[in-house]
């Protein structure tokens, strides 16, 4: 009933912070916006505003606001939940919440204590305290209804004791996001094979982790395999799984080299195992080790929309089809994808009557607004609705004359408006101060062309300080040394490292590629 109003309120508070015209209220806007997003089930956007709230929070906040902010930080950001000692009632509420998330017990007591606390705040008759205590009550009720202590045992049909150790750990989710509730409601945590459609940024990685944990805890599988079509994605998934499971589970990422660099001896380990590889590697393995599939109890295929990829989609599709024909219906197979136009057809083809389609159009990625700033001082906002969108070219590029080389007569400029790579470099230099930027090339050879152009611009005196200045100098020096050991000190890749620019493509040596991805992920480099 109130969902549309909550969405409007959250967008208003979000925009109010961006307007920068009432800075003294920004902390209230941020916390109110985070709460509005939270109550409308947009936990990703709530997390963003909550993080910004803690960067700007004022220690002089009232107690209900303080408790609410700390509780949201605890739920969304895995921050410590600090006990408020401003009033006895507030302290009791905090302690009861912390006790619940440590044991899974005492939900009824929380509601009773919260009611008493709300009554005491109303008696004080302080408007802002009343405003925040009402929102706090709503947030606590929603959080308890989506609590992992309640939903994971229910969805997996496993006793709470099998989840207890995990839920007491700091890495466990305190509540399930809509995406995780979706896979639970569809029976995926009970072993149901499924086609799962989830947009980016809604907790897909955590969903994969929960599926694997439920499969291991129930005894349905001791080995899970995750197949992802990109080597970089395999690296990212492997890091996430190692972080999530630690040394309790053996996480093994196969190389993408098509050779017999694996052994079935890895299945002799008593630990549960998570294997990660590309489709090409798995296809190679099962053609050389026919018994390999006998050891797998859970198959997870990521990025299912890659079926439509012209060069690799057929390999991926044939691999999944071959595996489906070799395994029994008891073994669980999950296909994850952000976008599948024919999801129902794929479900019938791949899973038949044994599987389900898990999809919910209400689960949306974090909304974004794109605006083009122009020399006319107007801002043109991009619309996803093609019926409302007009053709628009922003007049925001300033062309600059470059220094001439010795004996060079022709004046050269940057950017050349007919050169796509110049436009890309120009905007990357302008935008990288706001976060990492990537220039996408359609061929590997273009990577070197772009880097040579950046080096040429530096040599002609063009200011590229934004790229270098916003990168981590020490990390870039280390990467330059590593690049030098592969290519030599005078190679453009090595020189580019000193300018804050790194190459990345499939044939880059694996050690370099991993180092580049690590630097990009940890915000040490601003342009790839």
Where do the language-model regions lie?
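N-terminal helicase ATP-binding lobe
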Residues: 1-528
């Amino acid at each position: 009933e109130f969902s549309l109003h909550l969405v409007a309120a959250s967008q208003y508070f979000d925009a109010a912070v961006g307007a920068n015209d009432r800075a003294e209220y920004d902390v209230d806007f941020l916390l109110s916006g985070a709460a509005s997003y939270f109550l409308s089930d947009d936990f990703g956007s709530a997390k963003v505003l909550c993080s910004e709230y803690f960067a700007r929070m004022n220690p002089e906040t009232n107690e209900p606001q303080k408790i609410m902010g700390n509780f949201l930080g605890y739920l969304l950001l895995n921050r410590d939940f600090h006990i408020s000692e401003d009033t006895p009632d507030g302290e009791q509420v905090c302690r009861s919440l912390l006790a619940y998330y440590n044991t899974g017990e005492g939900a009824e007591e929380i509601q009773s204590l919260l009611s008493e606390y709300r009554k005491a705040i109303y008696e004080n008759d302080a408007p802002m305290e009343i405003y925040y205590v009402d929102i706090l009550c709503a947030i606590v009720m929603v959080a308890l209804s989506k609590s992992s202590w309640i939903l994971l045992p229910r969805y997996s049909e496993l006793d709470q004791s099998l989840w207890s150790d995990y839920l007491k750990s700091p890495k466990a989710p305190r509540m399930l996001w809509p995406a995780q509730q979706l896979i639970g409601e569809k029976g995926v945590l009970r072993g149901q094979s499924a086609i799962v459609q989830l947009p980016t940024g809604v907790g897909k990685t955590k969903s994969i982790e929960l599926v694997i944990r439920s499969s291991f805890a129930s005894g349905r599988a001791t080995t899970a395999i995750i197949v992802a079509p990109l080597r970089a994605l395999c690296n990212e998934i492997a890091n996430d799984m190692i972080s999530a499971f630690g040394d309790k589970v053996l996480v093994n990422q196969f190389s993408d080299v098509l050779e017999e660099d694996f052994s079935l001896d890895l299945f002799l380990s008593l630990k549960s195992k998570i294997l990660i590889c590309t489709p090409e590697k798995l296809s190679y393995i099962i053609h050389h080790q026919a018994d390999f599939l006998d050891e797998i109890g859970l198959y997870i295929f990521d990025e299912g929309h890659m079926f439509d990829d012209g060069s690799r989609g057929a390999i991926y599709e044939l691999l999944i089809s071959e595996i489906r024909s070799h395994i029994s219906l008891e073994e669980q197979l999950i296909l994850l994808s952000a976008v599948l136009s024919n999801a129902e057809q794929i479900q019938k083809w791949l899973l038949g009557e044994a599987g389900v389609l898990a999809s919910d159009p209400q689960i949306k990625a974090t909304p974004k607004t794109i605006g083009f700033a122009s020399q006319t001082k107007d801002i043109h906002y991009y619309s996803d609705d093609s019926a409302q969108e007009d053709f628009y070219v922003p007049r925001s590029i300033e062309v600059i004359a470059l220094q001439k080389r010795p004996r060079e007569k022709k004046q050269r400029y940057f950017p050349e408006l007919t050169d796509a790579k110049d436009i890309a470099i120009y905007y990357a230099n302008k935008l990288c101060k706001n976060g990492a930027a990537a220039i996408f090339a359609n061929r590997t050879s273009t990577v070197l062309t772009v880097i040579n152009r950046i080096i040429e611009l530096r040599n002609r005196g063009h200011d590229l300080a934004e790229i270098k200045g916003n990168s981590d100098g020490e990390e870039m020096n280390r990467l330059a040394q590593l690049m030098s050991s592969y290519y030599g000190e005078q190679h453009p890749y090595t020189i580019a490292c000193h300018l804050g620019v790194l190459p990345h493509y499939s044939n880059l040596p694996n050690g370099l590629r991993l180092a580049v991805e690590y630097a990009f992920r940890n915000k040490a480099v601003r342009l790839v």
